[in-house]
Amino acid sequence: NGATIDKFVGDAIMALFLESKNRSHEECAYNAVKTGLEMIEALRTFNQNRQDQVNIRVGINSGTVIMGDIGSKLYRRDYTVIGDSVNIAARLESAAEKGSVLVSDTTYKLIKDFVEIEDTSSIIVKGKAEELLVHKVAQLLPI
């Protein structure tokens, strides 16, 4: 779906859906949600005959990031992304229920014509003075 895996942090995966001359911001948001839903569905199939269930939560935000080598030549250096958009996505993942995709209002506005929402609510996240409007995705609609 056009993702770039940025890193694995413990049991978390940070994936990027980057805009390009061939891929719009809206398409990136759609593909991110599609990938999250596909991962959840794949785990449902995987878990069918398992006693110990594997579950994931998905948090998706859209926005500007700072991308590049972070660190120094003398110590650890990683090519990664940082910024408020990344932090919000991480907070959404933490706030999501197991087996669900939670998107920011920014992401929702990019794909609102192609997504069915199960629930909309506001959450308080660390580092933000105001509550964030978030949407729990029920399903994507065909483009």
Regions inferred by a protein language model and the residue ranges of each:
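Structural signal for well-ordered, non-membrane alpha-helices
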Residues: 37-44, 66, 93
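N-terminal start-of-chain detector that recognizes signal peptides
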Residues: 28-33, 73-75, 90, 105-109
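Secondary-structure boundary motif
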Residues: 45-49, 94, 113
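Hydrophobic alpha-helical membrane-association signature
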Residues: 31-35, 39, 84-88
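An acidic- and aromatic-residue-enriched active-site/binding cleft used to recognize and process polar
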Residues: 10, 38, 106
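Cytosolic regulatory/linker segments at or just downstream of nucleotide-handling modules
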Residues: 65-67, 89, 95-143
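Catalytic core of nucleotidyl cyclases, primarily class III adenylyl/guanylyl cyclases
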Residues: 1-31, 44-84, 132-135
